[in-house]
């Protein structure tokens, strides 16, 4: 993304993305996580069409180029999750904890893809604006306990969201 916190938009073309992916794989990466919408603090939500346009070149071609490497798509939007899974994406990483779209939790629960259940209060745009916890560790633990019951605990990674309002 043009406003990415990880690379500052250096790999925002299909060609540059694949060159960086090859470099990461050659360095030992076995999972590649890509996103078309920045989730850095203060970032704004973008239209799903723009997000898919940014992702689709990699998502549509990844498995033909890198059969043994897992592809993770970082998105909050159900539409992007669906499209990505049509191209055999291995993992969906949602910083909203599958709560941005009211139907994403039930959708992803039915999917065989691995999932990253993330903790964040608010949105990327607001998460740093005075987040409140009774006890940060217990609050996060309770969040995961509650949401793992909803999503199921098979094929789920949990991400406490360090830097996302903590």
Positions of PLM-derived features:
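Alpha/beta enzyme core
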Residues: 11-34, 64-67, 82-91, 99-113, ...
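Catalytic alpha/beta core domains of metabolic enzymes, predominantly
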Residues: 129-166
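Active-site beta-loop-alpha junctions enriched in small/polar residues
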Residues: 1-3, 37-39, 76-78, 95-98, ...
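Active-site mouth loops of central-metabolism enzymes
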Residues: 1-19, 44, 70-72, 128-138, ...
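Short catalytic-loop micro-motif centered on adjacent basic/acidic residues
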Residues: 71-72, 91-94
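Generic structural signal for helix capping and beta-alpha/helix-loop junctions
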Residues: 41, 81, 101-102, 125
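Alpha-helix-loop-beta-strand connector modules within alpha/beta enzyme cores
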Residues: 44-73, 79-83, 110-116, 120
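Glycine-rich, proline-tolerant flexible connector loops at the mouths of alpha/beta enzymes
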Residues: 5-6, 30-58, 162-166
């Amino acid at each position: 993304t043009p406003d990415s916190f990880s690379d500052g938009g250096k790999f925002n073309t299909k060609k540059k993305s694949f060159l960086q992916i090859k470099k990461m794989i050659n360095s030992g990466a076995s999972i590649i996580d890509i996103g078309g919408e920045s989730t850095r603090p203060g970032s704004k939500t973008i239209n799903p069409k723009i997000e898919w346009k940014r992702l689709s070149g990699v998502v549509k071609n990844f498995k033909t180029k890198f059969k043994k490497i897992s592809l993770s798509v970082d998105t909050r939007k159900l539409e992007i999750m669906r499209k990505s899974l049509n191209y055999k994406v291995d993992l969906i990483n949602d910083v909203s904890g599958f709560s941005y779209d009211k139907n994403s939790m039930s959708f992803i629960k039915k999917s065989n893809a691995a999932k990253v259940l993330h903790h964040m209060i608010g949105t990327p745009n607001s998460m740093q604006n005075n987040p409140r916890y009774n006890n940060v560790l217990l609050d996060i633990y309770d969040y995961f306990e509650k949401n793992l019951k909803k999503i199921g605990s098979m094929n789920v990674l949990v991400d406490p969201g360090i830097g996302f309002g903590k």
